[in-house]
């Protein structure tokens, strides 16, 4: 093995040692979501009349957030508000879309989707009964 080959191999190993963890982290789903959220947070403006609701990580539409939603949706002075509910799966989204199809100002997003991250950065009001990510 020549000196040049030996030095090249050592340099390659050291660079891999330094950069592989960074490359792995950048490819992770979690890092991708954090970066997307940060991009939306920087780019998007807060919408004055938008409310995001999340109950039990999107598993249901119940509890205090639902009571608040029902109260707001029935009052004429809150008609201009857009209500966005977080759901956990596509099937849940379809179920609630059908249930609330007559409400033009009610939408649903799947938890941790791009639409969810966008709504999280744009909504002036965040209503939940647990914690947001």
What is each stretch, according to the model?
Residues 1-48:
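Membrane-proximal basic amphipathic "stem/tether" segments
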